Amino acid sequence: MSHFHRTAAFHTLGCKLNFAETSTIARQLTDAGYDKVSFDDRADIYVINTCSVTENADRECKLHVKRAMKANPEGLVVIVGCYAQLKPEEISQIAGVDLVLGAKEKFNILSYLDDLEKSESEGVVHSCEIEETDFFIGSYSIGDRTRAFLKVQDGCDYKCTYCTIPLARGISRSDTIENVLKNAREIAERDIKEIVLTGVNIGDYGKGEFGNKRHEHTFLDLISELNQVEGIERIRISSIEPNLLKDESIELVSKSKSFVPHFHIPLQSGSDELLKKMKRRYLTKLYNDRVHKIRDVMPDAAIGVDVIVGFPGETEELFMETYNFLNELPISYLHVFTYSERENTEAVGMQGVVPIPERKKRNKMLRILSEKKKMAFYQTQLGKTLPVLWEHENKDGKMYGFTENYVRVQKDFEQASVNQIEFLNLEKILSDGTVSVQSSYESFLAKA
C-alpha cells in the first residue's frame, strides 16, 4: 500500500487536545511520505479523530465517514479518538470504516496501513482495555492555525458521575517538563505567536511524569518554567479545575509577560447539592473565591465557565441556584452543556431525570445569560488599546482576531496582518457580537 496511497486527510471532532493529537498523527504520516490534503479532497487515507463528550458522537462520526466516502469511495477510513475507544465494535459496523484504533494504538497508525485494504464488510478493530493506557505521548498542533495547542497532560483520575473521559483516556499522566519546553521552543521557532496548554486535567500536571503516580512536579512548576522560554508571545491556559487553580498560579499569570489574562474554569453546577451528586471536588464557596481572586489581581481578565444543565435531580429550584450564582459572579462567558446519559457512568442510574424539553429550556436561559455576560465584559474593554493576534481566515473580506483577554475583534482583511500582533483601540460592539478596532495612532488623532 505504501507505493500507492500517498495522500491523507484529517478531521477533528471535540476538544483542543484532539486537535493537538490529530496534528501529531498528521506529522507522522507526512514524515512517512504522505501529502496532506483537505478532507473534502480525494485522499487515499481519511483519519477522523472522534469525541465522546457531545451527545451526537455517533451521528457526527457517520456524517464524516460519508463525507470521506463521497470524496473518494475507494479511500481508506480510519477512526481514532475517545469515541473509538468507547465504542470500537459499533464504529466498525459503520459502512465505509476500515480501521478503528483505540487509545493505545492511535499513534501507531502507520504500522497498520501497509496491510490495510478497503473493507467490504466491517472495519478492523485494534482496541484495548483503558487500564493498559498508562503511557504519555506528547503532541502539539502546528501549521494550520495562528496558535498551537500543546498537550502537557492526558487522562483523569477524577470520578465525576456524568463523565466518560476517564473511560476513554485512562489515568492521569503527564509529559516531562523537559519535553514540554522542547516542544514549546519548536513552536516558537515556527513563528507561531500563541500556545494553548491542553490536557484532560492540566491542573493535575506532574502526576505520572516519569511513569509513576507521584507528582514529580506541579502545574505551578510547569508554568514557571514555560514563563522563562524566549520567543513565545502568548501562552493561554485552556481549562483548569477550580480546586487545582492555586493562588500562586494566578499571581504568576498576573505578572507574566507571556501568560495571558484568561482563565476557563469548569463549574458544572451552582448548586452544592448537585456538585456533591456529580462528585466534583469543590463547592460553590471555593469557586466563588477563585473567580474573585482572579478579579482582584487581574480586573480585565476573561473568565469562562463550563456548566451542565439537566443533570438528574436538578429541580427548578436547584437550576435557579445555578442561574443566580452565575448571574452574580463577575465572569465573562459560559459554555453551556445539556446533560445527556452516558453508558457506564454512575449518573445513568440516578433518580430525578429531567425531561428533554426542560433541559433545552434551561440551556437556552443560560446561553442568553452568557451573551449578556460577554457583552457586559466587552463593554468594559471599549476605548482601551490592546494587542490583537490576527487569524488567517478571510471571511467575506473580514478578518478576526483575539485580544489577550479573549475579546473577539474584526477589521477589513489584510494579508500583511495575518499571524501578526497589532496594538489597536477597541471601538464598538458590532451586530455580530465582535468588536471593531482602529489603530492606536488613528485613535489618537480622532481624540486630538
Model regions: which residues?
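Short, solvent-exposed loop/turn segments at secondary-structure boundaries
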Residues: 57-59, 171-178, 206-213, 277-280, ...
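Conserved SAM/AdoMet-binding glycine-rich loop
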Residues: 77-78, 86-87, 91, 189-316
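Terminal RNA-binding accessory module
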Residues: 349-448
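A structural micro-motif
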Residues: 34, 75, 98, 232-233, ...
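Proteins enriched for Cys/Gly/acidic motifs involved in redox and nucleic-acid/cofactor modification
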Residues: 1-205, 218, 248, 263, ...
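Glycine-centered loop/turn positions within well-structured domains
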Residues: 107, 158, 203, 243, ...
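Residue-level signal for inorganic ion chemistry
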Residues: 47, 82, 109, 197, ...
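Contiguous mid-protein beta-loop-alpha structural module that forms a pocket-lining wall or clamp
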Residues: 314, 330-331
